[in-house]
Every structure is written in C-alpha cells, then in structure tokens.
C-alpha cells in the first residue's frame, strides 16, 4: 500500500479483510475504494483461497477437506470438532462444544520422509507449500465451517501431509501470520517433526514458537531405521540429544508420538526401551494405534498391548495418553492422508 501511495490504514483494512473477515476476492473488499481495487488488480494482486475440491465427513464429525491450489495441486486439511483425541499433545479431551475444534494442517504436497507406516509417503514429495498456502488452508476451512476464531477455541496441529521442518522458512512465516494476523496464538499450535535435528535447534530459538512434538515410533535405532529411513541421517542419539537441549518453557513438556504397529514395535520390551530414551526429560507420550490403509503392510495392535505399553510408561512416571482415532472411516486419521477418494476401509 505504501508503494501505491496509500495511507497506512489501508494496509490495516486489507489485513483485516484477508485474515479476519476471510474475504475471498478483491471485488468483495467494499472497505477499499473501487479505483484502488482496480489498481491492485492491474498490478497483478489477487486473492487465491484454496478451492474446496472434495469434502468427506466421518461418523464422528471429523471432516477431511481436499483443497486445490491454483496450480492444480491439492492437499488435505482435517477439521476435528468437539475435541481432537489428544492431537494437541496433552491427551486431553476437549469439552462437548462446537466452539472448540482442531485443524490438522499440511505443510507440503506429499512427503519425502518415507515413513513406512504412512500413506502420505506413497505420494513422495511433489512440492513445498508457500506460507500463504499453509495459512490459506486454515482460512478456507474456517470459512467453510463458518467459525469465528475470536469466539471459538481453535487449535492447530501441523501434522498433515509433509514434514514442516523440511519447509521450515515457509512454516515459520505461516505461524507468524496465524498468530499475528489470523488471531490464533502459538500456544494453541503444535508442530510434529520426524526428527530434523538442525531444525529442532533452530525452532527452539524462535520468538513465536508453537509446541513441539517428536514422532518417535521406535525404541531403538535398528527398528527406527526400517520404519523411518530418516534415522540413517539423524540417529536416535542425535535426536534425543537435540530434545534434551531444547529450551522448554516453564511447565512445558515435550510430546513424543509413538505409532504402535502390531508385532513390530508394541512389545513390553519396546516400552521399557522408550522409558530409557526419555529418562530425565520433561516429556509426555501420545500412543497412536496404527490406522490402516491400503498398500501398507502393517496391522493395528491388540488393544491390550496398547494398554500394557501405556502402563509401563505411566509406572515410570511418564504421562502417557492413548490418542483416539478421528476420521478413520474417511481416511482422515493419523497416517492416512494420501488425497484418496476412499471413504470406507475394505
């Protein structure tokens, strides 16, 4: 606006319209004079909300959005009303009110990390999302759900498609916009990483910093290398060293997520090894029983194994929660995002 010779309040009007009122086109910007709107258009300025290509609704109220960008690429964003099954990293259930919800956000189209238990890995990495595209997902979902962030408690989890720390700069810009412009504080955001050690260090230095969750999923290097090939580059020793040096805030705990695969990483011995890994850390653990998907050769663990695993960690003094699956019937649960149009499990 300054380059166009406009007063400062025009920038505030634009900011308010984009991020708070979620205006989807310049023609709808009635707070701006028509000549200014035309000047913005002629200079190439445009608003491009992601297009809601498909919407799938689960029996539990979860909605999986397939959102398309201007280049034709699409990602999934998940809306979880009335609680998130522990997605915020504390295992708690939100109150029975539509005024509380969680949005699971993608940071890339596809993913390069190649976790063997995750359907997104089958896509490979197609491209990074810009900061605007990351924020645009959230604005599109809030607009579609007709939610006012000033009247509702909205949590964000960067746990959709992609590894946020492999698109770090755009992720950080998006977080800043979400906190300062959209009005969702970083205390209501959680980002999950597969263990990009240098970026964990960088993340700890940010002034505006969401909560951190580390996707662990194995209790030793041998198992983790097979399940998460990124371990070949950053071993558990390096990952846990970064976790121990991470500057936690007062009363903050680092979350470790652990996807339990039947007969693979769900034994009592695995649980005891996790206890040793986390010893001395101010940590909590979210256990996730694997959510099935086609072309993925694993099985969901026996519920008794999940509970036994949890009890060993609790007995060791580690707060441990079993995350309830949300949207499993529409392929919206953890590890199921692959831009599929399937809505029921075979």
Curated annotation (Swiss-Prot):
One of its GO terms (cellular component) is cytoplasm. It is found in: Cytoplasm. S-adenosyl-L-methionine binds at residues 162-163, 192, 215-217, 291. The keyword DNA-binding does not apply. Disulfide bonds join 104-334. [4Fe-4S] cluster binds at residues 111, 115, 118. Its EC number is 2.1.1.192. Keywords: 4Fe-4S, Cytoplasm, Disulfide bond, Iron, Iron-sulfur, Metal-binding, Methyltransferase, rRNA processing, S-adenosyl-L-methionine, Transferase, tRNA processing. Residues 97-329 form the Radical SAM core domain. The keyword S-adenosyl-L-methionine applies. Specifically methylates position 2 of adenine 2503 in 23S rRNA and position 2 of adenine 37 in tRNAs. Reaction proceeds by a ping-pong mechanism involving intermediate methylation of a conserved cysteine residue. NCBIfam families: rRNA_mod_RlmN. Belongs to the radical SAM superfamily. RlmN family. This is Probable dual-specificity RNA methyltransferase RlmN. It comes from Koribacter versatilis (strain Ellin345). The lineage of its organism: Bacteria, Pseudomonadati, Acidobacteriota, Terriglobia, Terriglobales. The gene is rlmN.
